[in-house]
């Protein structure tokens, strides 16, 4: 209906120095049925950084518009798919006025807000009359931002500025989104593997036997490594004496294959390189090729209705053909060239990252094992 009944006021929101700021391109879902791929460029802000700009109101057709006041708000919310039972949450919810005629840009209508963790607002203009275009500056000083922005398949962490023109009939509103990065101040430790290190000084992880696929079933053998701590806004990264211990996975199929998969540490910044190696102790399995993947796992919803979604952020082939006993394959995985998500966690969702080693034999059977790593953002 908005095609036939346009609001009498156009609202434009501009952030200070927006053009000179760093931007990120975020995939958005088209509001129509064509599902065309779209991207939106959003300015990036940090925790504690002030947010200011100018709101311009333009009256259509030079008509006078009465209003009950003009308000500007900055909002941060966690949004989840409507089918995930978010209505059971007792947390503070975002309430959407049914009388609001808003231009919401790329807001995903499939998702409901389950937690509004940030909401600050103040009046730009008292009740009165608009006869011509007017501009109003706004500023939110030292704005605290609890979570990093995130756009997943089932959950979003969204930040936006909302301007509302309050009226007796239908309110007119407009939002403008921005993106938030949270940086960890940890100093990264050396990312190397010493050839003289022994198992007694490493973080050993006892890997179980691989399970082969039958016809179409994949059986995953899970690592017994302790899970890395979940994080909220800043990851609690700690390095003892600045010397992280390497992680070693012993992987094997009885009387067929025995591999040592080792990498330098379990915590990486998004700009680092994962350095490791694969050492073959026993090779009676006819291997076709081997892949290394970095998998991002999103878990959303309440515990009774938890939904897990995996997406492969990185995949590349590290070996083609069979190997021989004693062969070593070096690994260098550069993280900076990919759009990765740091580990995140809150009451409604968490995001974890895993290294996955996949072996495919000549019969097409797949053997794989995963080990959790912690990713965090640094400047």
Swiss-Prot record:
InterPro entries referenced in this protein's UniProt entry, alphabetically: Arrestin-like_C, Ig_E-set, Vps26-related
Keyword Protein transport attributed: yes
GO MF annotation, one: protein transporter activity
Low complexity composition bias: residue spans: 84-107
Record's GO cellular component terms: cytoplasm; cytosol; endomembrane system; endosome; fungal-type vacuole membrane; retromer complex; retromer, cargo-selective complex
Region (Disordered) residue spans: 84-108
BP terms from Gene Ontology: endocytic recycling; intracellular protein transport; protein retention in Golgi apparatus; retrograde transport, endosome to Golgi
Pfam families linked: Vps26
UniProt keyword Nucleus, yes or no: no
Record Gene3D superfamilies: 2.60.40.640
Phosphoserine modification, residue list: 216
Assigned keywords, A-Z: Phosphoprotein, Protein transport, Transport
Family the UniProt entry places it in: Belongs to the VPS26 family.
Function according to Swiss-Prot or TrEMBL: Plays a role in vesicular protein sorting. Required for the endosome-to-Golgi retrieval of the vacuolar protein sorting receptor VPS10. Component of the membrane-associated retromer complex which is essential in endosome-to-Golgi retrograde transport. The VPS29-VPS26-VPS35 subcomplex may be involved in cargo selection.
Quaternary state and interactors: Component of the retromer complex which consists of VPS29, VPS26, VPS35, VPS5 and VPS17. Component of a retromer subcomplex consisting of VPS29, VPS26 and VPS35.
Protein name as it appears in the record: Carboxypeptidase Y-deficient protein 8
Gene source species: Saccharomyces cerevisiae (strain ATCC 204508 / S288c)
Record gene name: PEP8
């Amino acid at each position: 209906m908005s095609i036939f009944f346009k609001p009498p006021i156009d609202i434009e929101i501009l952030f200070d120095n927006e053009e000179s700021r760093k931007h990120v391109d975020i995939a958005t879902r088209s509001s129509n049925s064509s599902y065309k791929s779209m991207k939106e460029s959003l300015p990036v802000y940090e925790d504690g950084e002030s947010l200011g700009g100018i709101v311009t109101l333009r009256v259509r057709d030079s008509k006078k518009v009465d209003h009950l006041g003009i308000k500007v708000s900055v909002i941060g919310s966690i949004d989840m798919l409507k089918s995930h039972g978010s209505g059971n949450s007792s947390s503070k919810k975002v309430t959407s006025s049914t009388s609001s005629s808003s231009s919401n840009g790329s807001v995903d209508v499939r998702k409901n807000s389950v937690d509004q963790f940030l909401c600050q607002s103040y009046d730009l203009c008292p009740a009165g009359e608009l006869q011509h275009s007017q501009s109003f500056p706004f500023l939110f000083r030292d704005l605290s931002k609890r979570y990093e922005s995130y756009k997943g398949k089932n959950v979003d962490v969204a930040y936006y500025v909302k301007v509302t023109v309050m009226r007796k009939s239908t309110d007119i509103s407009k939002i403008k989104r921005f993106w938030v990065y949270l940086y960890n101040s940890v100093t990264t430790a050396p990312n190397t593997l010493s050839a003289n290190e022994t198992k007694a000084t490493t973080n050993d992880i006892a890997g179980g036997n691989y399970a082969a696929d039958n016809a179409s079933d994949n059986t995953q053998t899970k690592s017994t490594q302790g899970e890395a701590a979940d994080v909220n806004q800043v990851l609690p990264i700690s390095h003892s004496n600045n010397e992280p211990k390497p992680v070693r996975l012993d992987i094997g199929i009885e009387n067929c294959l025995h591999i040592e998969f080792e990498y330098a540490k379990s915590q990486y910044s998004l700009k680092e390189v994962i350095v490791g190696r694969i050492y073959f102790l026993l090779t009676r399995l006819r291997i076709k090729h081997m892949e290394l993947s970095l998998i991002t796992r999103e878990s959303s919803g309440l515990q009774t209705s938890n939904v897990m979604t995996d997406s492969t952020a990185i995949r590349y082939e590290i070996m083609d053909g069979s190997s021989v006993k004693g062969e070593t394959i070096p690994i260098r995985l550069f993280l900076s060239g990919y759009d990765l998500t740091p580990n995140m966690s809150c009451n409604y969702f968490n995001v974890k990252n895993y290294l996955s080693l996949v072996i495919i034999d000549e019969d097409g059977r797949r053997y794989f094992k995963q080990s959790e790593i912690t990713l965090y953002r640094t400047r």
